[in-house]
Amino acid sequence: GKSEEPNCACDQFRCGNGKCIPEAWKCNNMDECGDSSDEEICAKEANPPTATAFQPCAYNQFQCLSRFTKVYTCLAESLKCDGNIDCLDLGDEIDCDVPTCGQWLKYFYGTFNSPNYPDFYPPGSNCTWLIDTGDHRKVILCFTDFKLDGTGYGDYVKIYDGLEENPHKLLRVLTAFDSHAPLTVVSSSGQIRVHFCADKVNAARGFNATYQVDGFCLPWEIPCGGNWGCYTEQQRCDGYWHCPNGRDEINCTMCQKEEFPCSRNGVCYPRSDRCNYQNHCPNGSDEKNCFFCQPGNFHCKNNRCVFESWVCDSQDDCGDGSDEENCPVIVPTRVITAAVIGSLICGLLLVIALGCTCKLYSLRMFERRSFETQLSRVEAELLRREAPPSYGQLIAQGLIPPVEDFPVCSPNQASVLENLRLAVRSQLGFTSVRLPMAGRSSNIWNRIFNFARSRHSGSLALVSADGDEVVPSQSTSREPERNHTHRSLFSVESDDTDTENERRDTAGASGGVAAPLPQKVPPTTAVEATVGACASSSTQSARGGHADNGRDVTSVEPPSVSPARHQLTSALSRMTQGLRWVRFTLGRSSSVSQNQSPLRQLDNGVSGREDDDDVEMLIPVSDGSSDFDVNDCSRPLLDLASDQGQGLRQPYSATNPGVRPSNRDGPCERCGIVHTAQIPDTCLEVTLKNETSDDEALLLC
């Protein structure tokens, strides 16, 4: 296969592909042209010759199985290694000598081309060109003509940035699909490596390339000005911008000033219509080779311009996909809409499922209630029954007999305690003392008034509101006297006491007054006997002391004590013993944890703990005008001096340390006079002598 010839000799035949063959080869059932054009014009009716009729080939021919006729034929030696496959077994293109190609180029500019250009390059060509300009500036490589074999990917041209064949510095790969001109490749340095490789099947015209250092022009080119490149005389006023500034297309004869021709046919356009993505030229030359774009347009990598609104719209408008590169990931609106609708549907299904579940549950419960049995109703009635009253309430109401060691406090007893507290507060004027009792504050009053426990039975002796609860054998004629005695002792001007007295006479919860319960009367203990003896001796000592001092003291002779008064005195005596026991218990318990007792802290104005559950404790002291014997209760119930000695008595008087001031509010219970600073209370000194005996009697309990 030679290159195309304008004309063939008179004794030759011109093939359809431009190839010339001898006239004798025409219509010989062999494809010498390569495109079967020498056999298509023949109108032979006879069958092609068989292999048995094949004649030997001449010396300047070779035997080959034709690719077109599928029969053996004789081909000329000139068809071997011509780049065209004539034999079916590729025998005419095998073991061909490859011409030497490639060159080392060291100038600022130059040209190179493929082997046999503009003829077909030999099959299997393998050439390498090394361009080293010796300058650090870029090298511009331009392919003015490029045509490779289009039968496959076998023929290619690889361009590297530098002289080494480094895959990481590969600038571009050109194949038969890039068969258009011009093609421009720019390196980052002054060195480029160009490698051309062709397969052994078929061939093409090849390529022609030029190179130059950036800023220099070839001898036959005209500079565009500055670093805008160069153009040739043939490119002048051809309607195609070869210079970015359009210098090769300006001031053309067929256009006015500042206008550019669309082509050589005389149509022109202004600069403002250049590269605005609107074709003003019939051939669209005003939108080709755009180095810059008008405002509002996007410049593509292939030197085209598109609208900026078309960038990142999921459509390739540039043609090379450059308008869709580096776009942010945006979820489409239809995807969001589908997600919202799906969520609503799922929520609706969930609501329906919950509604069905509740409905099934209600139906199930209704069905279960419809099959309710008698036993289930009985169980429900048992579960809904009211809780029975407590054991203490039954004992207080008199429905059941009391049990030993079971603490019982009836409403009448509670009223007695309240009367005691109110009477001491209103008549005697003692300040209430708040004792922080921590965990024992809830039952301190029960311990005070239930202290006198029977040694034999172990039950507590309760303070009764009525005298007949203690001694049921007393006659009814003494009832007014007892009531009078109580009124004189507890003369409290409050409605609560009257209401409480009236309530004791009213009917109980069961429709009447509760029947009196049998109470165990404890025998006279050693403590009571000792307290009585101490009281009588204290009275005699007090009288003797007054006589020695020579003071005019009016003695009050106590009247004879009736049995009712004796009972009340016994009750108050037991209450006094209970208060003393509390004092003793508090002093003993506090001595383990701290050196100073809670009573000493109270006397010094220091409280042990700021607890919310404090007990308000009153210190009752009977008045001297009482009409019964109070000798047993002459000492203060919480006498701090008996436990702490004389050291605790000093804070009571700042002027006279040796005399203990009387904190009484009224006449003395022993002598009947009002003690002041001029009239010292000598009764207290007599009381101090009996403190030791009282403490010993208290320890017997």
UniProtKB/Swiss-Prot annotation:
Segments on the Extracellular face: 1-334
Membrane spanning stretches: 335-355
Stretches of the chain found on the membrane's Cytoplasmic side: 356-701
CUB domain mapped to chain residues: 101-214
Biased composition (Polar residues): 590-599, 643-656
Region of interest (Disordered), residue spans: 465-520, 535-565, 590-612, 643-665
Subcellular locations according to the entry: Membrane; Membrane, Coated pit
Occurrences of domain LDL-receptor class A (ranges): 7-43, 56-97, 216-253, 254-291, 292-328
CDD domains membership: CUB, LDLa
Gene Ontology CC entries for this record: clathrin-coated pit; plasma membrane
Residues bearing carbohydrate: 126, 208, 251, 283
Any Pfam family the entry gives: CUB
GO biological process, one term: endocytosis
Coiled coil: none
UniProt topology in membrane: Single-pass type I membrane protein
Keywords: Coated pit, Disulfide bond, Endocytosis, Glycoprotein, Membrane, Receptor, Repeat, Transmembrane, Transmembrane helix
Disulfide bonds, paired cysteine numbers: 8-20, 15-33, 27-42, 57-74, 64-87, 81-96, 101-127, 217-230, 224-243, 237-252, 255-268, 262-281, 275-290, 293-305, 300-318, 312-327
InterPro entries cross-referenced by the UniProt entry: CUB_dom (IPR000859), LDL_receptor-like_sf (IPR036055), LDLR (IPR050685), LDLR_class-A_CS (IPR023415), LDrepeatLR_classA_rpt (IPR002172), Sperma_CUB_dom_sf (IPR035914)
Highest taxon of source: Eukaryota
Known role: Probable receptor, which may be involved in the internalization of lipophilic molecules and/or signal transduction. May act as a tumor suppressor.
Family stated for the protein in its record: Belongs to the LDLR family.
Record note on quaternary structure: May interact with RACK1, ZFYVE9 and NMRK2.
Protein name per UniProt: Low-density lipoprotein receptor-related protein 12
Organism listed in the record: Macaca fascicularis
